[in-house]
Amino acid sequence: MGKWKVGTRRSKLALTQTNWVVDKLKGFAPEADFELHEIVTKGDRILDVTLSKVGGKGLFVKEIEQSLFDKETDFAVHSLKDMPAELPDGLVIGAIPKRVDPRDVLLSKDGKTLDELPQGALVGTSSLRRSSQILAYRPDIQIESLRGNIDTRMRKLAEGNFDAIILAAAGLERVNFEGEISQFLPVEISLPAVGQGALAIECRADDEETLALLKQFDDAPTRLAVSAERSFLHKLQGGCQVPIGAYATVGENNEITLTGMVGSPDGKQMFKNTATGQDPLALGIQVAEALLAQGAGDVLAEVLRENEQ
C-alpha cells in the first residue's frame, strides 16, 4: 500500500504525537504517503465535567476506533493511558514506541515544589489518581477539577485560578513546554497512570500490511512494561475514571518490576504493592490481587457508585 490514513485526535498534543509517529514511519517506508484524519472524541467534547462523572471507558478513543472498523483510517495514534485495558475484538496495538518520561509534574505560579506550596494551596487536576496521591501526601491541599488541553490548563494557572496544576511530563515535553515544569513528582509520591509516557498505534488485527509496517516501530521493553501495567488495570476493571496507578520497569533478563496503587479520592486510604516477574500478564494479576486482598476493591466499588450518581 502506498497510502496510509492515520486517525488522531484534534488537540495540539495529539497532532504533535501523530506527526512524530508519521515522521518515524517514513523512515521505514520512504515511498509511503500518510494522510491525517482528525477525529473529535466524546472526551474532547465534554469539558465542563470531570472525567470520572462523564462515565464509560475509552472516552478519547471510541470514535477513533470506529473509524478503523469503518476503514476510514488504517491506523491510529493514541496516548496509551487513554486506552481501556481491553481492546474491541478485531483491533490490536500494532506498535508501542519507546516510552518517554512517565512521571507527573507540578507547575506552580512561582516555581514552588509540592513541599513549598502554601498551606491550603489550590491545585488543579481532573484525575482522581493524581488527587488521591497528592492528598495522601499533603492532606491540607485543596483540589479543584481542571479539564482542557495543555494550553488551556496553563492559561488558567497563569491567570491565578490555581496555585499549581499537575500534568504529565510526556505531554509537556512533546510540545516543548519542559521549561514550565516546577517539579518532576517522584513515582513514590505520584505513581503514574497505566501506560503514561507511552504511545499506542492501533490497527485492524487482519491488516497484515499495516501490521508489518508498525512492527518495525515496536519497542520490546516498553511493551513488556506497559503489558504488565495494563494487565493490572484489566484485573481491577479500571479506566481513567478511577484512582488507579501503575508503573513497571524492565531490568536484566527481561525481569519486570511492577508497582500498583489504588487510593480513595480523599487520599485517606492508599493501597500499594510491588512485585517482580518475567510474565507481564501474570505479574499484573498478582499485584492487583495483592491490592484486592488489602481491601482495594471496596474503595473502587465506592468510587464507581459515586461516579454513577
Curated annotation (Swiss-Prot):
Enzyme Commission designation: 2.5.1.61
Keyword Calcium: no
Modified residues (S-(dipyrrolylmethanemethyl)cysteine): C240
Taxonomic superkingdom: Bacteria
NCBIfam families per UniProt: hemC (TIGR00212)
Quaternary structure and interacting proteins, as annotated: Monomer.
UniProt-recorded name of the protein: Porphobilinogen deaminase
Naturally occurring in which organism (per UniProt): Brevibacillus brevis (strain 47 / JCM 6285 / NBRC 100599)
Gene: hemC
